[in-house]
Regions:
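A membrane-topology feature that recognizes alpha-helical transmembrane segments
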Residues: 1-329
Length: 329
């Protein structure tokens, strides 16, 4: 079997794993609004194995293997946390293993810089042949900034759910590049994990329009203030709020003249209230003689990303398509 055939089998295996894994994750996230770390720990094993096989097929270079260790150590902190001095003193073998992996990874990165980056002409890295050890090492190294971007987006709440961030980190390991997979249609421009995120994000563009039509049909537009709410929220009976995955946007506040009034927030709270705190807010609204309130649903991003896996298989990178229709690709 030739190299191209081996990579093709590897690529399609990755895509099958991606679809099956995300189908299960989307189901769990939709039902529970939570995907336990144990789920990702099971699936990431297959992703790591396939990555090792890719390196073995393309370069079998010890520097690249070591650099991959740095990527895995950095990504593992999303599942097991960052090792601390206190944990190491307690003799936690998991934390010590991560530290060892970091050491191996730093060793690989150091020798990669020494061997593969000409200091007198750094721009030479842009012209490495795709089948060279240098190119494979550089592709492996570039997964680290991709993971950093995902983690920062998570911390800054650009990616709201932990399961969503861990899913994207999983994709970064499962499909670090497009080398092993050629989409049925279209071409590629950005890394696979970002292409998948864009495909999933397209579903959110249709969400405001859907909510506007839903609120108009339910006659939820009764004042000018309601117009500011209909594109991202819906009204729900107070009795149903605690049994649904929603954020309550209405709140009773005391106005400057000492009178209680209902204020609708345009954003969900930064920290989800406890059930007791939510019940107090609902009771305050009942005392204002209201029967329903504005809420925004906790839409699971994974439910939107999952269809994106199919779109990515058949249409590749959405950014490339945008550039194509703009006449730039």
């Amino acid at each position: 079997m030739g190299l191209d055939a081996s990579l093709a089998i590897l690529g399609w295996t990755r895509m099958v794993i991606l679809v099956v894994c995300f189908a299960g994750a989307a189901h769990l996230d939709n039902k529970q609004r939570k995907v336990h770390n144990s789920y990702w720990k099971v699936w990431v094993k297959s992703a790591v194995l396939l990555w090792v096989l890719e390196i073995a097929i393309r370069s079998d270079d010890w520097i690249t293997y070591c650099t991959m260790a740095a990527v895995l150590a950095y990504g593992s902190t999303a599942l097991i946390g960052t090792p601390t001095i206190a944990d190491l003193k307690k003799g936690s073998w998991v934390d010590w293993a991560v530290v060892v992996w970091y050491g191996i990874g730093m060793y690989g990165i150091y020798w990669g810089v020494v061997e593969y980056i000409p200091l007198n002409d750094v721009t030479a890295v842009l012209s490495y042949p795709t089948n060279s050890n240098e190119y494979m090492w550089l592709q492996t190294l570039m997964v680290i900034p991709i993971m950093f971007f995902i983690k920062m987006a998570w911390k800054l709440r650009l990616i709201h759910g932990g399961a969503d961030a861990k899913a994207l980190l999983f994709v970064a390991v499962l499909i670090p590049s497009w080398v092993t997979f050629v989409p049925v249609n279209g071409d590629t421009f950005v890394p696979p994990v970002f292409a998948l995120l864009v495909w999933g994000g397209l579903g959110f563009f249709l969400l405001p329009l859907s909510l506007i039509l839903h609120n108009i049909a339910d006659n939820n537009v009764k004042s000018f203030d309601d117009i500011t709410m209909i594109w991202h929220a819906t009204r729900m009976p107070l009795d149903e709020i605690t049994d649904n995955f929603v954020w309550l946007l209405d709140e009773v506040v005391i106005s400057p003249d000492g009178e209680p009034t209902i204020v609708s927030s345009l954003q969900p709270p930064k920290k989800s209230p406890t059930r007791e705190e939510l019940m107090i807010k609902i009771e305050e609204l009942r005392l204002m003689d209201v029967e329903d309130a504005w809420v925004t649903k906790k839409y699971p991003l994974l439910s939107y990303i999952f269809p994106g896996t199919i779109l990515m298989i058949f249409f590749g990178d959405p950014i490339w398509w945008i550039l194509y229709f703009a006449g730039l690709a």
